[in-house]
């Protein structure tokens, strides 16, 4: 052939066929893509043994024997009848339905397992006092698993009722007493009620500033910070956010300072400055008596 001649370059197209001059079945890799785009002929010629190419995938005999038989049966049925029979449709749709069913079963099993593990943890932690209303995603079967949210809601309701009951005896104390500067320590007993109650009420504003005229406004203002609920557990511990010791209000601090000034004005006065008298006494300080021979001690050694 012409490609064996040494003077002709190996990649140059020779003969009338051009790119097809290579042996059939051999793919030539180095050719101009522009010519190939313009040329309607295929870029690589089809192989010579077109009929012997195995178009069906090779399925090993050990595995998938059942699948191979079903495929062969479906092929024979489709070759006999032009319209595919409903048996083949059902055989095609069966694995899809099975997979979907297994997915649903697995998801329900997983949710049930997680719910049971949460339930077990709540039993150990002692948080199993009330139920839980499920969100829209949960099924009705899962509503029987109990939660803490409803317990907190019930505790808030109970604490609100106890706070209402404790407001009535406190209103009797809110009338200004004969001694307006009485210390609030006598009335702080109402802050910690005896017995086991579900909530510690907040410090009552009526007991904090009894002398002020706007008791009603301050009560409305402080009612926003309601009583904090206590979560009671089976272990006997009461869980509550620690807010520190009850701080006195600024009005209370100012009133306490005013009582101190009224009781003993001498103690509240600032101390007198006795600095000028002291300076007058210590005026005759000794002046430095430096003689020329003492300067040798004060000068650095390098001079």
Curated annotation (Swiss-Prot):
A single GO molecular function term of this UniProt record: oxidoreductase activity
Question: Where along the sequence does the record place the motif called Flavin-containing monooxygenase motif?
Answer: 67-77
Q: EC number(s) of the enzyme? A: 1.-.-.-
Protein origin, superkingdom: Eukaryota
Q: Hey, what tissues is this thing expressed in?
A: Expressed in neuronal pyramidal cells of the hippocampus and in the neurons of the cortex.
What's in the keyword line of the UniProt record? Cytoplasm, NADP, Oxidoreductase, Phosphoprotein
Where are the compositionally biased (Low complexity) regions? 170-183
What residue spans carry the Polar residues bias annotation? Answer: 76-89
Q: What class of enzyme is it?
A: oxidoreductase
Phosphoserine found at: 183
Q: Which GO terms describe its cellular component?
A: cytoplasm
Region (Disordered) residue ranges read: 1-20, 37-56, 66-96, 156-233, 260-283
State where the protein is found: Cytoplasm
Phosphothreonine-modified residues are where?
Answer: 44, 175
Q: What's this chain's function? A: Potential NADPH-dependent oxidoreductase. May be involved in the regulation of neuronal survival, differentiation and axonal outgrowth.
Its family remark reads: Belongs to the P33MONOX family.
The subunit structure is: Interacts with NELFB, NOL12 and PRNP.
Instruction: Return the protein name.
Output: Putative monooxygenase p33MONOX
Give the organism the record lists.
Answer: Mus musculus (Mouse)
The gene is P33monox
């Amino acid at each position: 052939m012409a490609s064996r001649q040494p003077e002709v370059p190996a990649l140059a197209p020779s003969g009338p066929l051009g790119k097809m001059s290579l042996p059939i079945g051999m793919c030539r890799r180095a050719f101009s893509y522009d010519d190939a785009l313009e040329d309607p002929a295929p870029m690589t010629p089809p192989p010579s043994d077109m009929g012997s190419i195995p178009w069906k995938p090779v399925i090993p005999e050990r595995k998938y024997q059942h699948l191979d038989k079903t495929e062969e049966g479906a092929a024979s049925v489709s070759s006999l009848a032009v319209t595919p029979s409903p048996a083949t449709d059902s055989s095609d749709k069966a694995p899809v339905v099975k997979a979907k069913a297994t997915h649903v079963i697995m998801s329900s099993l997983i949710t049930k397992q997680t719910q049971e593990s949460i339930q077990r943890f709540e039993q150990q932690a002692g948080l199993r006092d009330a139920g839980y209303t499920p969100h829209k995603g949960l099924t009705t079967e899962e509503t029987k698993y109990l939660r803490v949210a409803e317990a907190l809601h019930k505790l808030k309701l109970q604490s609100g009722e106890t706070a209402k009951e404790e407001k009535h005896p406190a209103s009797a104390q809110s009338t200004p007493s004969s001694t307006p500067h009485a210390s609030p320590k006598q009335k702080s007993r109402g802050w910690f009620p005896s017995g086991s109650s579900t909530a510690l009420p907040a410090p009552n504003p009526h007991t904090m500033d009894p002398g002020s005229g706007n008791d009603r406004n301050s009560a409305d203002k402080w009612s926003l910070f309601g009583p904090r609920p206590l979560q009671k557990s089976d272990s006997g511990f009461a869980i509550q956010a620690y807010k520190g010791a009850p701080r006195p209000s600024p009005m209370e601090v100012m009133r306490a300072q005013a009582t101190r000034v009224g009781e003993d004005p001498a103690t509240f006065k600032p101390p007198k400055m006795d600095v000028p008298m002291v300076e007058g006494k210590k005026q005759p300080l000794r002046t430095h008596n430096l003689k020329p021979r003492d300067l040798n001690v004060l000068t650095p050694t390098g001079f």
